[in-house]
């Protein structure tokens, strides 16, 4: 259950994020997306009651194990692709795909959670839809940093970041210095470890393309990646 204080929501101008999170979980009924069971409020608090995920979040497993095998990463990524496909079909960009926002159920399947930064009401065919600068620095796509405006393609870039972190234990381009990190994201080619299979390297290169129009998923969404 997530408990939100109304004074903090209003004081920090977070109303739209709380509403978006409730809306996204309410409209989606996908097996790989955390569902909202109940939503209610008292005088000073909002309550979002979500399904229980006993497996914890993916970041805890990465911290404990450093990285995952390609087979294990493939399983997680496959389920996440299906979840993103469902969101996109409902006109929603996730925009905050990272290990912290992926939880595991009782048998180890993935579920996406934390939709406060999602963008609703996406019109198919529009080139540039959202312009918000949002998300954790290491998980920003080039078009978000440059504030070009972004569409659903941003989620496929973040899928590449997530896959890279699963396989290597750290996001691509990472640096503790924000300015260097942004420069790396915008200018540097992704460094692919030799121990990765050719298929994994190819997928990472195509997902992490800096030009969203040339990125894998640009034409046919999830169908291009499956």
Regions found by a protein language model. Give the residues of each.
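Conserved short submotifs of the Hanks-type protein kinase catalytic core
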Residues: 44-57, 61
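Conserved end of the kinase activation segment
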Residues: 143-153
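Structural helix C-cap motif within protein kinase domains
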Residues: 168-171
């Amino acid at each position: 259950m997530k408990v939100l204080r109304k004074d903090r929501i209003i004081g920090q101008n977070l109303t739209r994020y709380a509403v978006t999170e409730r809306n996204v979980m309410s409209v989606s009924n996908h097996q790989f997306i955390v569902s909202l069971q109940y939503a209610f409020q008292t005088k000073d608090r909002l309550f979002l009651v979500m399904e229980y995920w006993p497996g914890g979040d993916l970041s805890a497993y990465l911290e404990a194990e450093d990285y995952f095998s390609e087979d294990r990463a493939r399983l997680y990524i496959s389920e996440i692709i299906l979840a993103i496909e469902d969101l996109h079909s409902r006109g929603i960009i996730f925009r905050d795909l990272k290990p912290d926002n992926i939880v595991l159920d009782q048998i180890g399947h993935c579920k996406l959670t934390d939709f406060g930064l999602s963008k609703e009401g996406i019109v198919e065919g529009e080139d540039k839809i959202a312009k918000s600068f949002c998300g954790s620095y290491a998980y920003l796509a080039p078009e978000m940093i440059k504030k070009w405006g972004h569409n659903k393609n941003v989620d496929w870039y973040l899928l590449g970041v997530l896959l890279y972190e699963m396989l290597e234990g750290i996001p691509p381009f990472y640096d503790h210095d924000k300015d260097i990190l942004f420069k790396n994201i915008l200018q540097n080619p992704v460094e692919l470890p030799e121990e990765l299979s050719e298929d994994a390297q190819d997928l990472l290169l195509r997902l992490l393309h800096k030009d969203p129009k040339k990125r894998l998923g640009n034409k046919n969404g999830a169908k291009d990646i499956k």
